[in-house]
């Protein structure tokens, strides 16, 4: 696939699976725009915007932000993009979001190219998330409010309950590719490249 062609990659996996790290690298190396609804929302919270004030209690509680807010953010981000070359990290999380995204991508003539699902055992995920918070604190950086064990466990449960149907949705469409998310970042990245050609 040449750089001038549409390419839409959707990263799936539980919180702490490494989606953000891998999406950043893939975006850089394949000239794709990374769209992370989590990053966009945290930026709004940090800036104290009206949207940030609305979603802060939701994020702090480890809950998922309502679809209407996320879909509006994505529509705005994709507006005018030509060609559409993007990686989604943290969106969609529900079948309703996936259907809305599919409709938007159809309007743009840019169907989903690949959906890698990063798979990591729950206890490894919790350890990664808590360690991410510890490392940020050691560096004197702000610690994400969701980088605690309690919130991380709640997020894992919410993920399982609300995201499994999405995994089934993409599997039924032949887009889903299972990727072992355990190993060094390079090992995981090389596995991702095998499914995102």
From Swiss-Prot:
Pathway(s) annotated for this protein in UniProt: Purine metabolism; AMP biosynthesis via salvage pathway; AMP from ADP: step 1/1
Keyword tags: ATP-binding, Cytoplasm, Kinase, Nucleotide biosynthesis, Nucleotide-binding, Transferase
Subcellular location: Cytoplasm
Region (LID): 131-147
Oxidoreductase recorded as keyword: no
Record GO biological process: AMP salvage
Binding-site residues for ATP, renumbered to this chain: 16-21, 132, 183
Domain of life: Bacteria
EC id: 2.7.4.3
Region (NMP): 36-65
Pfam families for the chain: ADK
Record GO cellular component, one term: cytoplasm
Record bears the keyword ATP-binding: yes
Its biological purpose: Catalyzes the reversible transfer of the terminal phosphate group between ATP and AMP. Plays an important role in cellular energy homeostasis and in adenine nucleotide metabolism.
Domain-level remarks: Consists of three domains, a large central CORE domain and two small peripheral domains, NMPbind and LID, which undergo movements during catalysis. The LID domain closes over the site of phosphoryl transfer upon ATP binding. Assembling and dissambling the active center during each catalytic cycle provides an effective means to prevent ATP hydrolysis.
Family of the protein in this entry: Belongs to the adenylate kinase family.
Protein name: Adenylate kinase
Gene that this sequence comes from: adk
């Amino acid at each position: 696939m040449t750089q001038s062609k549409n390419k839409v990659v959707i990263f799936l996996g539980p919180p702490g699976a490494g989606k953000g790290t891998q999406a950043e690298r893939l975006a850089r190396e394949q000239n794709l725009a990374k769209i992370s609804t989590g990053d966009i929302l945290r930026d709004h919270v940090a800036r104290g915007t009206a949207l940030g004030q609305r979603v802060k209690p939701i994020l702090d509680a480890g809950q998922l932000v309502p679809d209407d807010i996320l879909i509006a953010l994505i529509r705005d981000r994709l507006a005018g993009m030509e060609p559409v070359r993007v990686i989604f990290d943290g969106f969609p999380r529900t079948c309703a979001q996936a259907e809305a995204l599919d409709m938007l991508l159809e309007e743009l003539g840019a169907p989903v190219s690949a959906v890698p699902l990063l798979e990591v055992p729950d206890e490894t995920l919790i350890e990664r998330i808590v360690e991410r918070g510890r490392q940020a604190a050691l560096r004197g950086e702000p610690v994400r409010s969701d980088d605690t064990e309690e919130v991380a466990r709640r997020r894992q449960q919410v993920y399982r309950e609300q995201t499994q149907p999405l995994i089934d949705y993409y599997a039924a469409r032949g887009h889903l590719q299972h990727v072992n998310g355990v190993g060094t970042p390079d090992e995981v990245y090389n596995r991702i490249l095998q499914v995102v050609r």
